[in-house]
């Protein structure tokens, strides 16, 4: 068996259980529990809410954990590394206790290393790292830390169809896993649509027990749920408050339904992980979990069998309990290594075949330098041909566009030529039909020249007239722009003086806003006598009609000389009256201000007197401050001296307190031992007293029986001596 145990070398490394955190669901012995009342160790994270079963933890007679040692490297265990690797040694045990045998279970025997190890106890089974020690890669199930702030749930939790789907999945999961049988609580089809607080509590407890079976809910749900969600790293736990947990129905239910569905998926994932469904995915990601599974099975089985032994069990028997587990683990590792060896042989064969192919190709291949040179030449030719093709393609597009343009021009010229031919033919035919002679043609040409000259003179006069019209038009446009600017200034002043709009304070319901009644229509050539080129479109707004301008009275929308002027004069009169009243009020306020200034001067003189007193008080304050500072320095020196003495006293007191705590713990241990010894002595005394009472009773019965025999003997003797005097003898006997 020792040789089988030695075959574990170069396979795995077992760390001491003292340094391996308690990441299993197996309960720790009572000796491994920290006692915060006597030792000032702080609780590890989440242990205040994540409490294990107290029925298993309070057993005071539970033996200590085994100590599995390993070498720091992957080499052999050595000659003494067989079953001694699991020997319970005092020097390497997590409880560095007494000199020989099993270490003391007293809390005072804990060392600093065991304290740090107890602080590292796990808070739940789902967060354990690999027990195979630190690895060179990241875990396949490592979660990325959440971003700061409250994240937004991307799931459509408010969608009725989505709620129905995840609710049905959750209900099927609860039904398949015997929720009603375990929780003794019935579920209906509408439970996940309008649940009660009790339904939510039972469902949450059931789902979390699927994740961590050893957890015990000891507080209210609003106090238990937030730490659990934070510990599980629920991405949206910051959006769930205690008040919402106390009332899960109504508008809050979609949020809690999504949270319960997430817990269900987490439980399903853990079940699949336990069944090994993710092993292939882990292997694809480069994470081998088979070794972790073998070690975990070894630790759980060995720990279970080790717990079966009592406290009085010797080390040799404990080692014999672990031998089958070590052999089983060695066989599992050997089977795994055989698979890896087969894969390695296949890969080595493939590697050799590929190397042979490479060598053969290198032998048969031509000179690589020539091929590279030829390849570079071909690449250069390819680049040149591509440039040439791009150049030719550009020329092709250019010539195609030019051809299209020339074809269009040819078509236009041909159309014009055809129209001219048709016109010439029509004119020739009309001339032939009229029968015009040569004299008529000469006369018509002379008349045409005269009319042409008259047209040119008329056109010149029209140009001059048009120039004068354009000047007048430009002047009218400038005047119109000036008028528009004046109207804008008027309207601006009207807005400033609260005259515009009609709802303003000074308008009194009248509209004082000016606007120009300018025609925006553009007259066509038919309206202005068929001369579109002689009158600009910009001058259309200067005309009320095609050939008529605006009348001054019709250009503005208000009667400025009549209604507007009288209204403004009335407003000016009213404003003057208000101005006079304001001036009178201002004079009164100025008089009041003068009186206030006189009073302020008097107060200022009083303030100056008080300032003089203040300066005197400040001088007195500075003098007292210097005295106080001197006294403070002296007192600080005294305080510093007293603080040093106090620190020394505190150090002494701390040592004394530690000694007293140690003495108290030793006294408690001695008290427990004395109590046990007293109980045993009491039992022994009770047994001895009972035995003595039995002896006394037997002795009494024996004496009584002897007296009775002696009495009968005496009676017989008396009867024989006295003969028939039997009554007298009976009287004597009765008196006796």
From Swiss-Prot:
It comes from Aspergillus fumigatus (strain ATCC MYA-4609 / CBS 101355 / FGSC A1100 / Af293). Component of the NDC80 complex, which consists of at least ndc80, nuf2 and spc24. Residues 109-124 have a biased composition (Low complexity). Residues 327-492, 586-690 form a coiled coil. It is found in: Nucleus; Chromosome, Centromere, Kinetochore. The gene is ndc80. GO terms for cellular component: Ndc80 complex; nucleus. GO terms for biological process: attachment of mitotic spindle microtubules to kinetochore; cell division; mitotic sister chromatid biorientation. InterPro entries: Kinetochore_Ndc80, Ndc80_CH, Ndc80_sf. This is Probable kinetochore protein ndc80. Keywords: Cell cycle, Cell division, Centromere, Chromosome, Coiled coil, Kinetochore, Mitosis, Nucleus.
């Amino acid at each position: 068996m020792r040789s089988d145990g030695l075959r574990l070398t170069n396979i795995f490394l077992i760390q001491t259980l003292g340094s391996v955190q308690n990441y299993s669901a197996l309960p720790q012995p009572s000796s491994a529990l920290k006692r915060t009342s006597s030792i000032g160790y702080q609780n590890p994270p989440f242990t205040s809410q994540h409490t294990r079963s107290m029925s298993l933890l309070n057993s005071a007679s539970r033996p200590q954990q085994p100590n599995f040692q390993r070498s720091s490297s992957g080499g052999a265990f050595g000659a003494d590394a067989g079953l001694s690797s699991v020997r319970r040694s005092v020097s390497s045990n997590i409880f560095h206790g007494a000199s020989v045998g099993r270490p003391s279970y007293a809390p005072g025997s804990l060392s600093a290393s065991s304290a740090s190890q107890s602080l590292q106890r796990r808070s739940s089974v789902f967060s354990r790292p690999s027990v195979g020690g630190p690895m060179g890669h990241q875990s396949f199930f490592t979660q990325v830390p959440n971003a700061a702030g409250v994240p937004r749930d991307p799931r459509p939790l408010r969608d009725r169809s989505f709620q129905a789907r995840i609710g049905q999945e959750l209900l099927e999961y609860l039904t398949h896993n015997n929720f009603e049988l375990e929780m003794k609580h019935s579920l209906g089809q509408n439970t996940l649509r309008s649940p009660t607080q009790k339904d939510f509590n039972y469902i949450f407890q059931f789902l979390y027990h699927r994740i961590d079976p050893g957890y015990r809910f000891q507080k209210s749900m609003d106090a238990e749920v937030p730490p659990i969600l934070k510990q599980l790293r629920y991405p949206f736990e910051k959006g769930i408050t205690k008040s919402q947990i106390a009332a899960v129905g109504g508008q809050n239910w979609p949020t809690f339904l999504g949270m319960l569905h997430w817990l269900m998926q987490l439980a399903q994932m853990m079940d699949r992980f336990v069944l090994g469904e993710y092993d292939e995915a882990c292997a694809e990601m480069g994470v081998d979990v088979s070794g972790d599974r073998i070690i975990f099975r070894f630790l759980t089985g060995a720990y279970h069998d080790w717990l079966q032994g009592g406290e009085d069990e010797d080390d040799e028997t404990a080692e014999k309990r672990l031998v089958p587990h070590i052999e089983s683990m060695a066989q599992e590792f050997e089977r795994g290594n055989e698979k890896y060896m087969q894969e390695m042989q296949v890969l080595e064969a493939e590697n050799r075949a590929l190397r042979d192919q490479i060598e053969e190709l290198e032998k048969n291949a031509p000179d690589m330098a020539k091929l590279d040179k030829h390849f570079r030449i071909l690449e250069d030719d390819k680049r040149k041909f591509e440039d040439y093709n791009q150049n030719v393609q550009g020329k092709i597009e250019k010539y195609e566009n030019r051809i299209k343009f020339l074809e269009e021009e040819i078509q236009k010229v041909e159309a014009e030529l055809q129209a001219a031919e048709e016109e010439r033919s029509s004119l020739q035919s009309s001339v032939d039909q009229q029968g015009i002679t040569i004299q008529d043609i000469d006369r018509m040409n002379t008349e045409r020249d005269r009319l042409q000259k008259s047209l040119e003179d008329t056109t010149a006069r029209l140009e001059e007239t048009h120039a004068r019209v354009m000047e007048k038009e430009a002047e009218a446009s400038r005047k119109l722009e000036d008028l528009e600017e004046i109207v804008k200034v008027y309207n601006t002043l009207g807005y400033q003086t609260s005259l515009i709009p009609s709802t303003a304070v000074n308008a009194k319901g009248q509209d004082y806003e000016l606007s120009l009644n300018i025609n925006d229509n553009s007259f066509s050539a038919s309206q202005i006598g068929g001369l579109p080129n002689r009158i600009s479109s910009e001058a259309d707004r200067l005309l009320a009609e095609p050939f008529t301008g605006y009348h001054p009275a019709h250009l503005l929308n208000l009667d400025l000389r009549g209604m507007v002027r009288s209204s403004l004069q009335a407003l000016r009169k009213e404003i003057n009256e208000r101005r006079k009243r304001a001036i009178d009020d201002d004079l009164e306020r100025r008089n009041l201000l003068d009186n206030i200034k006189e009073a302020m001067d008097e107060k200022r003189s009083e303030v100056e007197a008080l300032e003089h007193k203040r300066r005197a008080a400040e001088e007195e304050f500075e003098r007292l401050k210097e005295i106080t500072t001197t006294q403070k320095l002296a007192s600080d020196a005294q305080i510093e001296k007293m603080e040093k003495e106090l620190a020394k006293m505190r150090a002494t007191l701390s040592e004394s307190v530690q000694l007293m705590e140690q003495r108290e713990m030793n006294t408690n241990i001695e008290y427990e031992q004395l109590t046990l010894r007293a109980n045993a002595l009491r039992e022994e005394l009770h047994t001895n007293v009972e035995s003595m009472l039995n002896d006394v009773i037997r002795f009494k019965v024996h004496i009584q029986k002897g007296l009775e025999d002696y009495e009968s003997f005496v009676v017989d003797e008396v009867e024989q001596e006295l003969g028939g005097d039997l009554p007298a003898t009976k009287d004597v006997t009765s008196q006796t």
